[in-house]
Amino acid sequence: MTNYNGLIVITGPSGVGKGTLVKKLLLENPEIWLSISATTRTPREGEINGKDYFFLNKKEFIDLVDKEGFLEWAEFAGNFYGTPRAQAQEKISVGKKVLLEIELDGARQVRKTFPEGFQIFIAPPSFEELEKRIRTRGTDSELAIQSRLNRAKEELLAKNEFDAIVINDQLDIALLEIKKLIKS
């Protein structure tokens, strides 16, 4: 059993299975609340404000940054993305577990802004297996694959910064390990 204050951060390289693990974890544990990110990008068709994202204009977003209103935030492709602090703290204050599935840089920011959170790094069984998974997706160009793999090498070097490392070799075993880690 892990002692933490309700905030769970899951990160790891692209292709490691974070998204799949998080989806299964949420399905089996409806008491866990997945944090909704804020963004300045334009909503895509069918996206709902407050459900898919909190859609903000750049001024609103920067105002929140200035007021330390995000646990973490970043700019990507000309838009801002961030995890609103208030909604996470509100859920935690009423005893809910809050889950963030974020990138390495965001996890590092959260460690500074909310150090009592529990951070889990999802790792592949090997770099070769990670490459195989990324290539098997069939969605990326060779250039994009190489970019993901180079980024993954950097991210894997950071795994010891985390409270726990879960190797996603077999999905069900990795999921069970995560559930044991966050059980309170």
Swiss-Prot record:
Keywords: ATP-binding, Cytoplasm, Kinase, Nucleotide-binding, Transferase. InterPro entries: GK/Ca_channel_bsu, Guanylate_kin-like_dom, Guanylate_kinase, Guanylate_kinase_CS, P-loop_NTPase. ATP binds at G12, P13, S14, G15, V16, G17, K18, G19. Residues 5-183 form the Guanylate kinase-like domain. SUPFAM superfamilies: P-loop containing nucleoside triphosphate hydrolases (SSF52540). It is found in: Cytoplasm. Its EC number is 2.7.4.8. Its main location: cytoplasm. It is an enzyme of class 2 (transferase). GO terms for cellular component: cytosol. It holds the Pfam family Guanylate_kin. PROSITE patterns: GUANYLATE_KINASE_1, GUANYLATE_KINASE_2. It catalyses: GMP + ATP = GDP + ADP. GO terms for molecular function: ATP binding; guanylate kinase activity. Essential for recycling GMP and indirectly, cGMP. Belongs to the guanylate kinase family. PANTHER family: GUANYLATE KINASE (PTHR23117:SF13), GUANYLATE KINASE-RELATED (PTHR23117). This is Guanylate kinase. The gene is gmk.
